[in-house]
Amino acid sequence: MPVNPELQGRVLPAAAPYLVGREKVREFARAVGATHPVHLDPEAARAAGHADVVAPSTFPVVLQAMTVTQLLAEPDTGIDYSRVVHGEQAFTYTRPVVAGDELTATLTVTKVATLGGNAMVTAESAMVDGSGAHVVTAVSTLVVRGDDA
């Protein structure tokens, strides 16, 4: 079954709020080699003007993965997860993510295209804090390999 082109423009319900934990930020920072003290030490983060440790710039993939999982669970996508590879990732920030943030993400499928027999699905996950203020938007492109790939 090919990827459903009518996915383009679909907005999924907001994912459950995600509480950014200090230890989760530290674990992620260590995993990606982000050694700056603001990622690991609350005092260093406070000295730099932040309320708590600052998540590395790619940390929002944790929450975005939850929204993409919602998309893949939709019965009419035509996306065979066994044929999916990650194509591209980008982030647009309003402010840094810090421990203690409670973020809610809403996914919008912004583009469905075919290139070289493969489907390309681009999705934006807009993340807001508990007050509803925008924090970051994560944009990713999933490549769904075609039958000949």
From Swiss-Prot:
Belongs to the UPF0336 family. GO terms for biological process: fatty acid biosynthetic process. GO terms for molecular function: (3R)-hydroxyacyl-[acyl-carrier-protein] dehydratase activity. Disulfide bonds: none annotated. SUPFAM superfamilies: Thioesterase/thiol ester dehydrase-isomerase. InterPro entries: FAS1-like_DH_region, HadA-like, HotDog_dom_sf, UPF0336/Enoyl-CoA_hydratase. This is UPF0336 protein CMM_2793. Residues 16-117 form the MaoC-like domain.
